[in-house]
Regions:
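Short, well-ordered, aromatic-rich surface patches in folded extracellular/luminal domains
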Residues: 5, 21-40, 88, 95-154
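Short, solvent-exposed loop/hinge segments that bridge or flank secondary-structure elements
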Residues: 39-52
């Protein structure tokens, strides 16, 4: 009986260690995180995107008409900022989410999206209704919205 408890303990320990390693390796393998919003029926800057990697954070704004001149800017990404973004997707739950959740931009409600690109070329993008993010993304989206808020489209 005691031997079975010890075996069970080691099995649980092994599973926990394996899960942590896979999450940690995913964290280390993130190459880029992209986030954006869009509104189909709008005037002015209807699309706002931010792209974050270990070197730069790039911002862009665009509209649907030619009268709206697209804007772009970029700043250097600090190590602490990059680490804080990468840690947000420090699990496999993001990659298990469907590509589309709900009805993004239906009735001009707007859409938000997050895309994670890994060093091996794998990428996954999730699009969802504006300010109706899935529970798995709530902390990630809060941080990404904060970063995107620095994008001043004029």
């Amino acid at each position: 009986m005691k031997l079975k408890r010890v075996q069970l303990f080691f099995v649980i320990l092994l599973v926990t260690a394996t899960s942590s390693c896979s999450n940690e390796s995913l964290y280390r393998n993130v190459a880029q995180v992209n986030y954006g919003t869009s509104f189909g029926m709008c005037v002015g800057y209807c699309k706002r995107d931010v792209s974050i990697d270990s070197v730069y954070t790039s911002y862009s704004c665009a509209g649907w008409s030619k009268e709206v001149e697209p804007t772009q800017s970029k700043v250097q990404t600090t190590k602490s900022a990059w680490d804080s973004v990468k840690v947000l997707i420090n699990n496999k739950a993001f990659f298990e989410l469907p590509a589309t959740i709900g009805c993004p931009d239906c009735a001009d409600g707007g859409a938000e999206w997050v895309e994670v690109k890994l060093l091996n070329g794998t990428a996954h993008k999730v699009v969802f209704e504006y300010y109706n993010e899935p529970q798995q993304l709530q902390s990630s989206i809060a941080k990404l919205r904060q970063i995107a808020g620095k994008n001043e489209c004029k």
